[in-house]
Amino acid sequence: MPEELSKKQTTRLNKLQKRLRREVGSAIADYNMIEDGDRVMCCLSGGKDSYAMLDILLNLQQRAPVQFEIIAVNLDQKQPGFPEDVLPAYLDSLNVPYHILEKDTYSIVKEKIPEGKTTCSLCSRLRRGTLYGFAQRIGATKIALGHHRDDIIETLFLNMFFGGKMKAMPPKLLSDDGANVVIRPLAYCREKDLEEYAELKKFPIIPCNLCGSQENLKRQAVKDMLNQWNRQFPGRIETIFTAMQNTAPSQGVDREQFDFVSLKRDPDAPMKGDVAEANLPAFDFLDIANSGHIDLDAAKRIDIVNVYEV
């Protein structure tokens, strides 16, 4: 039997639960992740994030203004040492409908990936394909994954540094074939909060390194960089995520996102200065007649004292 929490731990758990519930609720509302009548397939890996996601979604299910189903699904990829009884026992205790799928992707990965190389990428693709197909079989209208805010930010920098793309993990995604909608209810949640929540809730965590593969070194390098920034500049990670939600294509350089080629000056636009010059008289700098000069009152005149050439 798990040890009972102290009064201090119980208080902390309640605060964390409220925060995570609020953040998940906000993400669901902001991106219209869950709608009335949805059948949500909640993908469980046995890690802290997916446990927390299921726990919070079950909690919100009792309070949400819409009705939706939750079906938990785990894919047993036949990794050596995988404890097959852990998830069924946990899900039975919650009285949650669930499916355990069995597919030996481990052997496929070991056959295709050279010894010593990271297998996570191929393993993830094989897992995703199986889960997408099963979602259609059971009539799931949404597939919920346990990626959190840190995952999203890390993916942005991974793609920037190593892929040359401004691309992250969207909170809501339509699969390429249009058959599945993927949602990430933990998109606003911090990893450290989820770690603490999982520890206090005493989820039966299954390690993700049973296959023997080391975590992607590039992702770990990005994670270390972000952690260092967070220590050195508190609040920077929050600012990065806010920036990701406030993009301005017209202020970038991506011609696919904004039509720079067709930009033309409007010759009929009213003659006025820039916003920074709102109090100055308006004139046309391109008008040859005034040669770019205008007479100002002495009080408004700026004298140039010295000009230095570099």
UniProtKB/Swiss-Prot annotation:
Its main location: cytoplasm. It catalyses: cytidine(32) in tRNA + S-sulfanyl-L-cysteinyl-[cysteine desulfurase] + AH2 + ATP = 2-thiocytidine(32) in tRNA + L-cysteinyl-[cysteine desulfurase] + A + AMP + diphosphate + H(+). [4Fe-4S] cluster binds at C120, C123, C211. Its cofactor is Mg(2+); [4Fe-4S] cluster. Binds 1 [4Fe-4S] cluster per subunit. The cluster is chelated by three Cys residues, the fourth Fe has a free coordination site that may bind a sulfur atom transferred from the persulfide of IscS. GO terms for biological process: tRNA thio-modification. It is found in: Cytoplasm. It comes from the Bacteria. Keywords: 4Fe-4S, ATP-binding, Cytoplasm, Iron, Iron-sulfur, Magnesium, Metal-binding, Nucleotide-binding, RNA-binding, Transferase, tRNA processing, tRNA-binding. InterPro entries: Rossmann-like_a/b/a_fold, TilS/TtcA_N, tRNA_Cyd_32_2_STrfase, tRNA_thiolation_TtcA_Ctu1. The keyword DNA damage does not apply. One of its GO terms (molecular function) is 4 iron, 4 sulfur cluster binding. SUPFAM superfamilies: Adenine nucleotide alpha hydrolases-like (SSF52402). The keyword tRNA-binding applies. One of its GO terms (cellular component) is cytosol. A motif (PP-loop motif) lies at residues 45-50. Pathway: tRNA modification. Its EC number is 2.8.1.-. Homodimer. Catalyzes the ATP-dependent 2-thiolation of cytidine in position 32 of tRNA, to form 2-thiocytidine (s(2)C32). The sulfur atoms are provided by the cysteine/cysteine desulfurase (IscS) system. The thiolation reaction likely consists of two steps: a first activation step by ATP to form an adenylated intermediate of the target base of tRNA, and a second nucleophilic substitution step of the sulfur (S) atom supplied by the hydrosulfide attached to the Fe-S cluster. HAMAP family: TtcA. Belongs to the TtcA family. This is tRNA-cytidine(32) 2-sulfurtransferase. The lineage of its organism: Bacteria, Pseudomonadati, Pseudomonadota, Gammaproteobacteria, Alteromonadales.
